């Protein structure tokens, strides 16, 4: 798990974006 705060919205929608950031 990465250092991220508990997001109030659906985190699943951000997963693709997060993956792109890590890459």
UniProtKB/Swiss-Prot annotation:
Subcellular location: Mitochondrion matrix
A GO molecular-function annotation: metal ion binding
Any GO CC annotation of this UniProt entry: mitochondrial matrix
Catalytic activity: 2 superoxide + 2 H(+) = H2O2 + O2
Textual note on the cofactor: Binds 1 Mn(2+) ion per subunit.
Annotated InterPro entries: Mn/Fe_SOD_N, Mn/Fe_SOD_N_sf
Keyword Ribosomal protein belongs to the record: no
Subunit note: Homotetramer.
Swiss-Prot/TrEMBL cofactor(s): Mn(2+)
Keywords carried by this UniProt record: Manganese, Metal-binding, Mitochondrion, Oxidoreductase
Location (main, coarse): mitochondrion
One Pfam family it belongs to: Sod_Fe_N
Protein name: Superoxide dismutase [Mn], mitochondrial
E.C. number: 1.15.1.1
Function recorded in the entry: Destroys superoxide anion radicals which are normally produced within the cells and which are toxic to biological systems.
Protein origin, superkingdom: Eukaryota
Family the UniProt entry places it in: Belongs to the iron/manganese superoxide dismutase family.
């Amino acid at each position: 798990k990465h250092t991220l705060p508990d997001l109030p919205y659906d985190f699943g929608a951000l997963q693709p974006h997060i993956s792109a950031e890590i890459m």
